[in-house]
Amino acid sequence: MMRKKSFWLGMLTAFMLVFTMAFSDSASAAQPAKNVEKDYIVGFKSGVKTASVKKDIIKESGGKVDKQFRIINAAKAKLDKEALKEVKNDPDVAYVEEDHVAHALAQTVPYGIPLIKADKVQAQGFKGANVKVAVLDTGIQASHPDLNVVGGASFVAGEAYNTDGNGHGTHVAGTVAALDNTTGVLGVAPSVSLYAVKVLNSSGSGSYSGIVSGIEWATTNGMDVINMSLGGASGSTAMKQAVDNAYAKGVVVVAAAGNSGSSGNTNTIGYPAKYDSVIAVGAVDSNSNRASFSSVGAELEVMAPGAGVYSTYPTNTYATLNGTSMASPHVAGAAALILSKHPNLSASQVRNRLSSTATYLGSSFYYGKGLINVEAAAQ
C-alpha cells in the first residue's frame, strides 16, 4: 500500500514539474521582445552647439551616438523604440530621420544596343578601341561625365567644338560612344576615340560649306568613321566630292536618311545620305517597326533604332529623342565595332558587312537591306 502511495505521489510531482516547465516556457514566449535599435540622424536646434550637449541629449533619451557631423548640426545615433520617442519629444531636437540606405545607380543599356546585337560584340571584348569616330553635328559637351571627347574642330563662328548649345550632337555622341562606366548610358562603341566636329550652330543649322569643311577635316585627320546626323533637301557638287573623297580614302561615311516620312512612291531621302558613298540610315522602333517619320527611297541602305532613343544630353544629363539622327550613330558605332575586331578592313568591306548581314524587314524602298546585326557583321 505504501508503494502505491509513493508511486502516485511521484507521478503527481512529475506532472506538476512538467506543467510548471511548460507554463514557464509559455510565459517566456509571451514576454515582449527587446526593442530593436535602428540607425537615425538626429538634427538639433540652432542653440545646441557643443558635442557634449548633443551627446547628453541622445544618451539621456536612452540612445547612443555613433557619429557627429562636422558641418551640419546633427548626429548619427542608435535608438530603440523608446529612445526614439524620447528624442523626438526633446525641445532641443529639430528633427529625427531614419538613416536610409542609398545604392549605386546602374548603367542603363538603351534598347538599341541589344536590338542591333552590339552587346554581343562588346562581350567578346571589342568595344571600338583604336577607332576614330568624328561626329559632325552641333558640337559635343566634352565635360559630360559619360563621354570622352579626345579632340575636334569647329566650323561655326564663335562656337567651340567641345560645347553644345543645342543638345543634338551630345545625344548623337552618346549613342556612338557613351562610356562603359557603370553609370548613365552605354554607347554602341564605348571605347572609340571620339571627335567633335562642329558644323551646326546652337540652333541646329549649318551651311553646306561648313559641312564640307568638317568632312575635309575628318578625312585629313585620319578619322575611320564619320557620322552626319544632318541633312538638306538640295544636292551639292562640293558636298558630293567631299564624301566621295572621304570614302575613297578609307573612311566609313554614315548619314541620317531624313525625317520626311513617306508619300507614295516619292523619294524623301535628303543629302548627303543620298550620295552613293554614304550609308543612308532609316529608323525603326524597339519592335523593329519602321518609324513613321523615317524617309524612304532607293538609296536607303540599312535601318537602326531611332524612336525613343535615350542618350547623353547637356548639361551632364540624359534625354530621349526621336529621328533618323538617332539611328545613324547606331550604324557609325557598329562600323567602329567591326573595325576594332577587323582593323584591316576597307570602308567598302565594312559597309558590305553591315548591309549583307542586316535582318530583312520588308521592301527595300522602306527598309533598305533591313535592321543591322552587328554580331553577324563582325564575324
Curated annotation (Swiss-Prot):
One of its GO terms (biological process) is proteolysis. Inhibited by p-chlorophenyl and 1-naphthyl boronic acid derivatives. Residues 30-105 form a propeptide. This is Subtilisin Carlsberg. The active site is at D137 (charge relay system), H168 (charge relay system), S325 (charge relay system). Residues 1-29 form the signal peptide. Residues 44-102 form the Inhibitor I9 domain. It catalyses: Hydrolysis of proteins with broad specificity for peptide bonds, and a preference for a large uncharged residue in P1. Hydrolyzes peptide amides. Pfam families: Inhibitor_I9, Peptidase_S8. Keywords: Calcium, Hydrolase, Metal-binding, Protease, Secreted, Serine protease, Signal, Zymogen. PROSITE patterns: SUBTILASE, SUBTILASE_ASP, SUBTILASE_HIS, SUBTILASE_SER. Ca(2+) 2 binds at A273, Y275, V278. It is an enzyme of class 3 (hydrolase).
